[in-house]
UniProtKB/Swiss-Prot annotation:
<dbReference type="GO" id="GO:0005524">
    <property type="term" value="F:ATP binding"/>
</dbReference>
<dbReference type="InterPro" id="IPR020003">
    <property type="entry name" value="ATPase_a/bsu_AS"/>
</dbReference>
<dbReference type="GO" id="GO:0009535">
    <property type="term" value="C:chloroplast thylakoid membrane"/>
</dbReference>
<dbReference type="Pfam" id="PF22919">
    <property type="entry name" value="ATP-synt_VA_C"/>
</dbReference>
<comment type="function">
    <text>Produces ATP from ADP in the presence of a proton gradient across the membrane. The catalytic sites are hosted primarily by the beta subunits.</text>
</comment>
<dbReference type="Pfam" id="PF02874">
    <property type="entry name" value="ATP-synt_ab_N"/>
</dbReference>
<dbReference type="InterPro" id="IPR000194">
    <property type="entry name" value="ATPase_F1/V1/A1_a/bsu_nucl-bd"/>
</dbReference>
<keyword id="KW-0406">Ion transport</keyword>
<keyword id="KW-1278">Translocase</keyword>
<dbReference type="InterPro" id="IPR055190">
    <property type="entry name" value="ATP-synt_VA_C"/>
</dbReference>
<dbReference type="InterPro" id="IPR003593">
    <property type="entry name" value="AAA+_ATPase"/>
</dbReference>
<dbReference type="InterPro" id="IPR050053">
    <property type="entry name" value="ATPase_alpha/beta_chains"/>
</dbReference>
<dbReference type="InterPro" id="IPR005722">
    <property type="entry name" value="ATP_synth_F1_bsu"/>
</dbReference>
<dbReference type="GO" id="GO:0042776">
    <property type="term" value="P:proton motive force-driven mitochondrial ATP synthesis"/>
</dbReference>
<keyword id="KW-0139">CF(1)</keyword>
<dbReference type="Pfam" id="PF00006">
    <property type="entry name" value="ATP-synt_ab"/>
</dbReference>
<keyword id="KW-0150">Chloroplast</keyword>
């Protein structure tokens, strides 16, 4: 067993034991603190500043030691606003890293980076806590068996299936549907698998965090009547927080997920929205700490910081953490160092396309750009693999023909190519799907489609059995039977109009 959760927080009891320092300098969220000789705190130790500001308001700021400067000074990054702090204020070294509550007490609750509840539902049981900094599991503890994680979303399960205990990246620019896709996955997984999820909101909009919380209460993922029956713990460090909080909130969420995996021996889902904001916060902190920037202005420690987070997300003999991470792609440039570094850690990538979103095809998952290491015949089986490859070939041929169609029109294509285009357009529309969490916007009830149903549907389109049906019948439906029923309805409607 790897985790040794402590049974109380890093509180210091008597005055004699306290290691006290004083603030020597404040630059935004970065504090320099002077300690007595021989009493220097360790790197990553939590420091607490308590006192009153100039107007008598209570101040309680937690910081994390980042650098030992020499001359008995340390440089620390604040986890909350430094408003009201002054030079000379007393600082307490807790002699331990930040520790957060873990276990069943966290379910159904919203926490900040320090593990404090922020949902006005009273205190949380903090008898079991874990430090947020920990090494990754040893090789001998890792579990290497391969199995598919069914999501109920057609395009994902068929073309870029997720690995149980793997890491999945959701790539896309602003406004193409990353957060909606994450909400749908949380919903489907809670209902279909009954698993526990931990959601880490890293540097995203407060409104989205609130919407997600309300959505979860409505869908029953969070049980208001009996909080302990809830299926998710939420940890937020949103856009308005200082960079220190945004940089560490991912580790807080991961620590809670690790406890469910290692101690409760459960399969856990860890959602991080957005991993780019973790890198962005690290970049801000790096500049404030005086490090020389690297490529495109990012921190020189980018790969190390990313690795220390990602390597802890894995399957062990006790349980698994399957992680789904939204990755904002700055200016839709996949070669930017932040998304490029993230790619190296992923088992599957789900790339969202602005072109598909513009066509109104949701989820706007690009079927040709999205990849998965799981799409191999020995893992998914021959039937699934063959169907996925034929779907990709058809869509790729359609993509190649689009320039010819734009210049010369469909009539100039050969009979075979025209058939390919017709089927590709049906496939493109059949890859769309109504979501449970988007019912409010679309008015269509959400659909969960099993993998076997998904494969059957695409096989029927590819075989030519459904060539007579109109394209519109395949748009925003669940399984293939719904598409044929929709085609009949469309036919009836068109007859009535005549």
């Amino acid at each position: 067993m790897r985790i040794n959760p402590t049974t109380s927080g890093p509180e210091v009891s008597t005055l004699e034991e306290k290691n006290l320092g004083r603030i020597a300098q404040i630059i935004g969220p970065v504090l320099d603190v002077a300690f007595p000789p021989g009493k220097m705190p360790n790197i990553y130790n939590a420091l607490v500043v308590k006192g009153r500001d100039t107007v008598g308001q209570q101040i309680n700021v937690t910081c994390e030691v980042q650098q030992l400067l020499g001359n008995n000074r340390v440089r620390a990054v604040a986890m909350s606003a430094t408003d009201g702090l002054t030079r000379g204020m007393e600082v307490i070294d807790t002699r331990a890293p930040l520790s957060v509550p873990v276990g069943g007490a966290t379910l159904g609750r919203i926490f900040n980076v320090l593990g404090e509840p922020v949902d006005n539902l009273g205190p949380v049981d903090t008898r079991t806590t874990s430090p947020i900094h920990r090494s990754a599991p040893a090789f001998i503890q890792l579990d290497t068996k391969l199995s598919i994680f069914e999501t109920g979303i057609k395009v994902v399960d068929l073309l870029a299936p997720y690995r149980r205990g793997g890491k999945i990246g959701l790539f896309g620019g602003a406004g193409v549907g990353k957060t909606v896709l994450i909400m749908e996955l949380i919903n489907n997984i809670a209902k279909a698998h009954g698993g526990v999820s931990v959601f880490g909101g890293v540097g995203e909009r407060t409104r989205e965090g609130n919407d997600l919380y309300m959505e979860m209460k409505e869908s029953g993922v969070i049980n208001e009547q009996n909080i302990a029956e809830s299926k998710v713990a939420l940890v937020y460090g949103q856009m308005n927080e200082p960079p220190g909080a945004r940089m560490r909130v991912g580790l807080t969420a991961l620590t809670m997920a690790e406890y469910f995996r290692d101690v409760n021996e459960q399969d856990v889902l860890l959602f991080i929205d957005n991993i780019f904001r973790f890198v962005q916060a690290g970049s801000e902190v790096s500049a404030l700490l005086g490090r020389m920037p690297s490529a495109v202005g990012y921190q020189p420690t980018l790969s190390t910081e990313m690795g220390s987070l990602q390597e802890r997300i894995t399957s062990t003999k006790e349980g698994s953490i399957t992680s789904i991470q939204a990755v904002y792609v700055p200016a839709d440039d996949l070669t930017d160092p932040a998304p490029a570094t993230t790619f190296a850690h992923l088992d599957a990538t789900t790339v969202l396309s602005r072109g598909l979103a513009a066509k109104g095809i949701y989820p706007a998952v690009d079927p040709l750009d999205s990849t998965s290491t799981m799409l191999q015949p020995r893992i998914v089986g021959e039937e699934h693999y063959e169907t996925a490859q034929r779907v990709k070939q058809t869509l790729q041929r359609y993509k190649e023909l689009q320039d010819i169609i734009a210049i010369l029109g469909l009539d100039e294509l050969s009979e075979e190519d025209r058939l390919t285009v017709a089927r590709a357009r049906k496939i493109e529309r059949f890859l769309s799907q109504p979501f449970f969490v988007a019912e409010v916007f679309t008015g269509s009830p959400g659909k969960y489609v099993g993998l076997a149903e998904t494969i059957r549907g695409f096989q029927l389109i590819l075989s030519g059995e459904l060539d007579g049906l109109p394209e519109q019948a395949f748009y925003l439906v669940g399984n293939i039977d719904e598409a044929t029923a929709k085609a009949m309805n469309l036919e009836v409607e068109s007859k009535l109009k005549k």
